[in-house]
Amino acid sequence: MKRVLSIAISRAAAALLAVSAVVSCMKPFEYGDGFGFIDPVEGTSDRPVRTPTDLKRNVLLLYSAGHTTGIPKYLKEDIDDLKTGWLPDGVGFSNDVVLVYTHLPKNVSGYSWDYSSYNSPVLYRLYAGEDGTVVSDTLCVYPPETVSASAQQLNEVLSYVHEMFPAKGYGMIFSSHASGYLPNTFYNDPGNYIYMESPAGRQTLSVSRPDVPQPVWMREGPMVKSLGYDYFRPGDYVATYEMDLKDFAAAIPMKLDYLLFDACLMGGIEVAYELKGKCGKVGFSQAEVLAEGFDYKTLTSHLLGENPYPQGVCEDYFQQYDILYGNERSATVSLVDCDQLEPLAAVCRELFAKYRNSMNALRAGRVQRYYRYDCHWFYDLYDMVAEAGADSSELARLQEALDLCVDYKAATPEFLPYSYGFSIDVFSGFSMYMPADGNVELDKYYRTLQWNKATLLVE
């Protein structure tokens, strides 16, 4: 077991932060100024110059939004596991960078959490020190009332990372509850959802009594991770915050090489298409994610180095569940190339138009689903088109477009079979909304998504 050395901001700074609402950040302990490790490039003078185009290192950020119900224990364990894996040696400009943004409730004891007061999120850097130590270097401490499930906070963290750690490439793992493309508040209370346009970037606040129904992910069965969900209970009411998919995408200030979601139900074509232009590869699950999530002990071995390999993370994720039994053998995952989505959109637009009537009359029980209970907003993209009546040549064209953008996909034969789960007989690598089993108010929101604008699934 590696030992952990924590370098934190001074006590005086911490005390000042406790009485202020201003974020406290420090510049990274790196040498030199300007850019990362670069090769000398001949200039017009006798002295060699350096250029930012020759950056060598990669940056990995784990954004762990854990001030929520059910999963703080697992998110804390994920970070602990991350510290046992391979880490860069030191903090020089030549070294890769591992950053962790974590926001957990206050820990009472063991795995008991206090939601009645706010707790400060922290951004820190992990690296290997001397004698096998793991150094946790605190970079930023944010105000206790910070909402991590907000586009504003996500943008602030990513902007800091981009500015302070110039690099060849950037990647992010997002770990929290999530509900795919669905608008804020819809997943847990679809019957009361009414679509209303809201200002971009504003997280949704829901205030209710403490005896509100449990979120879907807290119902019977193994604990699951279900974009961002902050939960506070400061008094005789409950306050929850969620982030909109469109705002999430807009908050990313630079193009990421990869974005991996350790969160439920994010594996939809709607999510991938909304992130087109924001990341090269996206890895996600079409169904829920059991709370243990990714294999954080091996994660850095795939994502650091000259050529990050996010597919390795997806492969490890699937394999760790596929060897189990019963409910625990439950996983869906795919890795998608977001730069290759246009051919799929073109084929789907044509087929959606041709088979619109039959798609709008599809019977839910005949199409591969990825949901439990009554959360019927996630079906298999390919299976919908097949059940709508597409012929063999059309399905071949659809499969060709899928093969072009889906780099990797895997699914267990069943998903939570003893907890209202389902069999997996068809797996295209994408889930999708099925209007035939949809919701009028959800249709209104769905029309605002880039996937619908490109394909007119919902007219």
What are these regions (language model features)?
Residues 199-459:
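Terminal, contiguous helix-loop blocks that mediate binding/assembly
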Residues 66-70, 104-108, 146, 176-182, ...:
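Solvent-exposed loop/turn segments at secondary-structure junctions
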Residues 71-110:
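N-terminal carbohydrate-binding/catalytic regions of secreted carbohydrate-active enzymes
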Residues 128-163:
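Functional beta-strand-loop-alpha-helix junction segments that form "active/interaction loops"
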Residues 1-3, 20-55:
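Bacterial Sec-dependent N-terminal signal peptides
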Residues 2-13, 285:
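Bacterial N-terminal signal peptides that target proteins for export
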Residues 56-59, 91-98, 165-171, 253-258, ...:
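Loop/turn elements at helix/coil->beta-strand transitions in domains of secreted/extracellular proteins
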Residues 103-139, 173-234:
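Surface-exposed loop and adjacent secondary-structure segments within mature catalytic domains
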